[in-house]
């Protein structure tokens, strides 16, 4: 089984990436699946102009990202909440593909520095994923107060709480 974890923030000083690292480590240590982080900060996709299938000369990184999604048995999206929504980098990546998302099992981890763990982003992300035909796991994983609960290496500071 192969799982892709999308680390969606490209922000300087991002904290949500810590959770991508945490889940990768957890899945590997428990031998649950082959796992890879697809870090949108590394891809740096240009602003969306056209879906991949309609691009005349798509960049290699775009084709590689699409192949990772297609070849994954499931996807975990790790996203911060920005003003009640998810970052433009994630919207850009979602819109870049279309058929690749259809019937793809997707779960998401929402992250915030506040008390609610990105609860507001759940609605907007869920709606976008439903519209493209993804199969969304009905149990998001909200992470509140990320700075108090995880470090930059993706380690839980309170192991009893994870």
Explain the meaning of each model-derived region.
Residues 1-5, 45, 105, 144-153:
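A short small-residue
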Residues 29, 136-162:
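Glycine-rich phosphate/pyrophosphate-binding loop and the adjoining helix
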Residues 87-103:
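Rossmann-fold NAD(P) dinucleotide-binding segment
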Residues 32-34, 103, 133:
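A generic structural signal for alpha->beta connector loops
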Residues 1-79, 84-92, 156-162:
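N-terminal beta1-alpha1-beta2 submodule of the flavodoxin-like/Rossmannoid cofactor-binding fold
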Residues 105-145:
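Short, glycine-/small-residue-rich phosphate/pyrophosphate-handling segment
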């Amino acid at each position: 089984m192969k799982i892709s974890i999308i680390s969606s923030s490209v922000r300087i000083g991002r904290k949500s990436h810590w959770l991508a690292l945490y889940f990768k480590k957890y899945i590997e240590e428990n031998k649950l699946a082959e796992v890879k982080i697809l870090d949108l900060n590394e891809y740096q996709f240009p602003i969306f102009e056209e879906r991949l299938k309609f691009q005349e000369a798509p960049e290699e990184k775009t084709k590689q990202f699409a192949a990772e999604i297609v070849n994954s048995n499931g996807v975990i999206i790790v996203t911060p909440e920005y003003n009640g929504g998810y970052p433009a980098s994630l919207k850009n990546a979602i819109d870049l593909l279309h058929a690749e998302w259809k019937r793809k099992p997707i779960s998401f981890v929402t992250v915030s520095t506040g008390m609610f763990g990105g609860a507001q982003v759940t609605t907007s992300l869920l709606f976008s994923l439903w519209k493209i035909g993804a199969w969304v796991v009905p149990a998001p994983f909200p992470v509140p107060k990320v700075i108090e609960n995880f470090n930059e290496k993706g380690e839980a500071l309170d192991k009893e709480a994870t």
